[in-house]
Amino acid sequence: MVNTIGFDREKYIEMQSQHIRERREALGGKLYLEMGGKLFDDMHASRVLPGFTPDNKIAMLDRIKDEVEILVCINAKDLERHKIRADLGISYEEDVLRLVDVFRDRGFLVEHVVLTQLENDNRLALAFIERLQRLGIKVSRHRVIPGYPTDMDRIVSDEGFGLNEYAETTRDLVVVTAPGPGSGKLATCLSQVYHEHKRGVAAGYAKFETFPIWNLPLEHPVNLAYEAATVDLNDANVIDHFHLAAYGEQTVNYNRDVEAFPLLKTLLERLMGESPYQSPTDMGVNMAGNCISDDAACRHASEQEIIRRYFKALVEEARTGKDSTQSDRAAVVMAKAGIKASQRVVVEPARQVEERTSLPGCAIELVDGSIITGATSDLLGCSSSMLLNALKHLAGIDDAIHLLSPESIEPIQTLKTVHLGSSNPRLHTDEVLIALSVSAATDSNAQKALDQLKNLRGCDVHTTTILGSVDEGIFRNLGVLVTSDPKFQKNKLYQKR
């Protein structure tokens, strides 16, 4: 069922942009739209909703670009944690700059960055503020508010949101986005609404969060995959009891939105006389659930994503020495979905290679459903071996033909070990691809193999040991979805990334 389309991209772009327009018109005045998830690179959505492209949200906003201004926010504590966007391999700090650049390249207005939960002893955050200001970006500092989100008298006062710096915007639709979850988007929106009303400007709030999908069942795999993706935040999908009480309709939301709803409703009532929303679901503008074209395809894709998240949590715990809290949470999500790690079809073939050779093994599932494996040899690591074998299969090249001869590999090994000081003579995936590119000038088979690289995108891979940063980066750039068993090839205290 690899790459079966389950989501109607064009229907989504049209329906979603129209619904946002309608919400702004219904509320009147200025609208702060909290944009959950990732705008440009929503890899998670593209994995669990096959057919949803990573740029689907920004393509939708392109329809109303001239009406939109962007606010990017980042949690100052994430700078202290050196938090990384795993799908891109860059820090949240760098991703803020990348987001500003990409927005501007597409013609969006973006002038402000908001640092949330800022404390004066956070030296990394203060240094980042100076960096942003040197780059000509306006910065607003939002503080840690004691009692948030329960002490409403304090929050909706000069001692709460009033302590936050106001980001002065010029357009009536302000999209608030961030590098990842937990960045303080909701608090940023509420703080801005507070300051707008203090200035006599009518302003409202709405939320655009792709997951959980409110009109899918609570334990639909698409919604469970969201829980698996946020095990580090301990988020959970819940029934929106406010919506059930107000309308008698059962919808799904996530725990932090439900917990924050009394604050939002109270804030809007104090500022506007009444709240336009009776539930967290009312706040949302998400149309994704209406654009699923093949439920079975989305279920299967989401189940595979849950398993990938489980392996990811195990690997992260092995790398950092943390306890099993996150993988335990992911295991609970797998149990809710009624699936097991063994249902990731590339896991057992990779382990069988290791059992047979006593060295790391690797396996990939290709678009045609074929499982191709790779073993560790004196010349190649298992990922490199698998990559060459997969390209040969896709290109229809006989398995007996060597795309790279030992004679072409040995000089590279000599360069690595003799001149560059590496202790590992085996070729990594980047070195294999460079060697293959050189060979393609004189070898038609090598060129045929290179031409198949595009057909690896979206394929699943499993390795029996944790990948180093080089192989991890190559697979990411190829669009391959990799998991690993949570062990290193060498049993050492220090493990090079």
Curated annotation (Swiss-Prot):
Belongs to the UPF0371 family. NCBIfam families: PRK13663.1 (NF010184). This is UPF0371 protein DIP2346.
